[in-house]
Amino acid sequence: MRKTIYLLLFFFFLITSCSEEKTDFILKGQISGLSSDTLLVYYQVPEFKLDTIFCQEGKFEYSIRPDTITMFSLIFSSEESLPVFADKGQTVEIKGSTTDFEIQGKGENKLMNEIFSLLKATPEKNIRQVVDSLIQTNYQSFTNLYLLDKYYVNQEHPDYNHLKKLIESQSGIIKDTPYMMLLQPKTEDLANENSSPRVVN
């Protein structure tokens, strides 16, 4: 009888612990050089939306409960932003300044930190070549949304033909994001327009 009670208690605690599986994503940060005590949060995956984070002397903590992998960017200025990838039960820490930071995390966040470190060590003249290689090598990674936007879309004179080829090299899961579903047809139209022969009168 006593063994039966112990077994029942064991299974009860086992079920309880499983049901209490962590589902929140937590972002902790300490960023110097912020121009305001409020950070704008721009969500890109799985949907577009905005939020804000309140900071105290550059420190903040932000938590969400994602149903699936979620990508959002912390907007530091019109030129500087930091992409963050939220998944169930994970914690990510960010330390540094608005222009030089370190991301401590797993998966896509770890990859993004490695990419930032690589680009920081790359001479300016070789940046585009390295970014090209990263985008095509990591064709299933959400980090490419950041790279495509920063180094190709937000340029004074975008190369739409090259951008089109890079987009085509991405996996279905990346192409199906809201950002890419808007970008791809627009890029194809502009690439075709630039490739069309011009009639000279």
Task: Locate the predicted segments by residue.
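Sec-dependent bacterial lipoprotein signal peptides
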Residues: 1-16
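A non-transmembrane, solvent-exposed segment enriched in polar/low-complexity residues
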Residues: 18-138, 142
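Canonical tetratricopeptide repeat
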Residues: 109, 144-145, 180-181
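Alpha-helical repeat scaffolds
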Residues: 126-133, 160-170, 196-201
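Short solvent-exposed coil/turn linkers within tandem alpha-helical repeat scaffolds
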Residues: 137, 141, 173-180
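Amphipathic alpha-helical repeat scaffolds of TPR domains
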Residues: 140-150
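Short coil/turn linking the two alpha-helices of tandem helical-hairpin repeats
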Residues: 152-157
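N-terminal "domain-start" segment that seeds a small globular fold
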Residues: 183-201
